[in-house]
Swiss-Prot record:
Subcellular location: Cytoplasm
Protein name: Aspartate--tRNA ligase
Stated family: Belongs to the class-II aminoacyl-tRNA synthetase family. Type 1 subfamily.
GO MF annotation, one: nucleic acid binding
The protein's assembly and partners: Homodimer.
SUPFAM superfamilies: Class II aaRS and biotin synthetases, GAD domain-like, Nucleic acid-binding proteins
Enzyme class: ligase
E.C. no: 6.1.1.12
Known role: Catalyzes the attachment of L-aspartate to tRNA(Asp) in a two-step reaction: L-aspartate is first activated by ATP to form Asp-AMP and then transferred to the acceptor end of tRNA(Asp).
Lineage: Bacteria, Pseudomonadati, Pseudomonadota, Gammaproteobacteria, Enterobacterales
Gene behind this protein: aspS
Length: 590
């Protein structure tokens, strides 16, 4: 039906007769001439109809936006004054000799000339995806997956599929369950990840595995999460953590070079402890130059409980954040930041405005200065390298609240004041995470998952002091986004059962949920390690959007619903009966 794509026509096509298929993007009727911007997957080209082709001109008068059409015509060079440098096809146009209206379009529910609500865009997604910027994002996604496959193939990885219908295992989020008709009362679970299957593939001797795979997690959503998402899943045998990182870093550098033309260079490596201390986050955005500075040792003896309490508490922390040029912030802005940190559990936000250091106490403005002597204030200014015109914010509480609140404040202030260099790419590896964290109920939970190996600990040492265990785990972070994470896995049955025990999983439950894994660990399991990238998040970064729904063809809302298909929906009672399922409706409160 066509000879060329609209968006691929160039000066080299001048004089050629072409047949194009696509949609009317815009129409301009000048009476004796009609111009349309004709669009397809590859882009837009200008087509015009003149009086010498009367039949085509007459039919063109009926065209409206989003009509699906076929045009045959001759490619012509535009006059110099009419060249459109903003279009890839801007040096040429097509003089139409014939026009076929393949399908007409009703009045559109989306307006291409205005910003449409996200609800409307998702409801009429098939129209939203016609927009060039949306089409380009999905084309970039396709390019990324193609590049990944070629890279992994070139590095000896085998693309192996794993089951979608599997057994529920605790991986941190709720499972999506699928009832079995054959096995009454039993359910499959859709996989949160192929974690155990890819480990079993290493035990089977496949050495290097990868898969671009759908995963499912029934969890609360936010802008960068979906109930179903896509992973670039990787596992290797007989490779150390640094070796895995080296290959995966090479993959990501390859993607950025091919898609963006950017060489990311070598990724710095930072421990979890250092990231939390300096940036208040385990996924620091290194484009932001501000860092947290510990000042607790300077404040232990002050007569100000807000500072002295955390300063003398082993579980407490007092951290300062120097904001270059921040002394210009108004009282209203400071109050807004004070309310902002309360979201993260902070009780307030103390500060020192540094107007003129040479004047001592007279050169600063601070509601807490009366509690601090000149010597302590000077020591704080020295340690934070404060200069005239700077602002110093303080966080004082338990370590987690200080990290969360001050880390979030650092990001917000950096963006608000233009301190974060949005033009840069700042990748890094974060390693040496705590193996466990407090579950809030007196127990421990795995910080990553229960199959991660501890670093330099025996099973006995781990059992004796689990709170001191460091996980042999690593996350890749780019511009403050965790784009991938992985670890060295446990390949010893005793160690695996020890970890299960620490997590409160008794032997009976271990056999019930993980018996197949524990059995497999008895038969010469190789050391193995792996990683998974979030394809959606990688694509989001590479296409420059801050909404993950922009890089998924048919995404869900934050309520895990598809507005287009109206999924989820009620099931037919007959089908439910076949599955031995009865829906119990909660009584409404009167």
């Amino acid at each position: 039906m066509r000879t060329e794509y609209c968006g691929q026509l160039r000066l080299s096509h001048v004089g050629q007769q072409v047949t194009l298929c696509g949609w009317v993007n815009r129409r301009r009727d000048l009476g004796s001439l009609i111009f349309i911007d004709m669009r397809d997957r590859e882009g837009i080209v200008q087509v015009f109809f003149d009086p010498d082709r009367a039949d085509a001109l007459k039919l063109a008068s009926e065209l409206r936006n989003e009509f699906c059409i076929q045009v045959t015509g001759t490619v012509r060079a535009r006059d110099e004054k009419n060249i459109n440098r903003d279009m890839a096809t801007g040096e040429i146009e097509v003089l139409a000799s014939s026009l076929t209206i393949i399908n007409r379009a009703d009045v559109l529910p989306l307006d291409s000339n205005h910003v449409n609500t996200e609800e409307a865009r998702l409801k009429y997604r098939y129209l939203d995806l016609r927009r060039p910027e949306m089409a380009q994002r999905l084309k970039t996604r396709a390019k990324i997956t193609s590049l990944v496959r070629r890279f992994m193939d070139d590095h000896g990885f085998l693309d192996i599929e794993t089951p979608m219908l599997t057994k529920a295992t605790p991986e941190g989020a709720r499972d999506y369950l699928v009832p079995s008709r054959v096995h009454k009362g039993k359910f499959y679970a859709l996989p949160q990840s192929p974690q155990l299957f890819k480990q079993l593939l290493m035990m089977s001797g496949f050495d290097r595995y990868y898969q671009i795979v759908k995963c499912f997690r029934d969890e609360d959503l936010r802008a960068d999460r979906q109930p179903e998402f896509t992973q670039i899943d990787v596992e290797t045998s007989f490779m150390t953590a640094p070796q895995v990182r080296e290959v995966m870093e090479a993959l990501v550098r390859h993607l950025w070079l091919e898609v963006k033309g950017v060489d990311l260079g070598d990724f710095p490596v930072m421990t979890f402890a250092e990231a939390e201390r300096r940036y208040g986050s385990d996924k620091p955005d290194l484009r932001n130059p501000m860092e947290l500075t510990d000042v607790a040792d300077l404040l232990k003896s002050v007569e100000f409980a807000v500072f002295a309490g955390p300063a003398n508490d082993p579980k407490g922390r007092v951290a300062a954040l120097r904001v270059p040029g921040g002394a210009s912030l108004t009282r209203k802005q400071i109050d807004e930041y004070g309310n902002f940190v309360k979201i993260y559990g902070a009780k307030g936000l103390a500060y020192i405005k540094v107007n003129e250091r040479a004047k001592g106490l007279e050169g600063i403005n601070s509601p807490v200065a009366k509690f601090l002597n000149a010597e302590i204030i000077e020591a704080i200014l020295d340690r934070t390298a404060a200069q005239d015109g700077d602002m110093i914010f303080f966080g004082a509480d338990n370590k987690k609240i200080v990290a969360d609140a001050m880390g979030a404040l650092r990001l917000k202030v950096g963006k608000d004041l233009g301190l974060t260099d949005e033009s840069k790419w700042a990748p890094l590896w974060v390693i040496d995470f705590p193996m466990f964290e407090d579950d809030g109920e007196g127990g421990l939970t795995a910080m990553h998952h229960p199959f991660t190996s501890p670093k330099d600990m025996t099973a006995a040492e781990l059992k004796a002091a689990p709170e001191n265990a460091v996980a042999n785990a690593y996350d890749m972070v780019i511009n403050g986004y965790e784009v991938g994470g992985g670890s060295v896995r446990i390949h010893n049955g005793d160690m695996q059962q020890t970890v299960f025990g620490i997590l409160g999983i008794n032997e009976e439950e271990q056999r019930e949920k993980f018996g197949f894994l524990l059995d497999a660990l008895k038969y010469g399991t190789p050391p193995h390690a792996g990683l998974a990238f979030g394809l959606d998040r990688l694509t989001m970064l590479l296409t420059g959007t801050d909404n993950i729904r922009d890089v998924i063809a048919f995404p869900k809302t934050t309520a895990a619903a598809c507005l287009m298909t109206e999924a989820p929906s009620f099931a037919n009672p007959t089908v439910l009966a076949e599955l031995s399922i009865q829906v119990v409706k909660k009584a409404e409160n009167n």
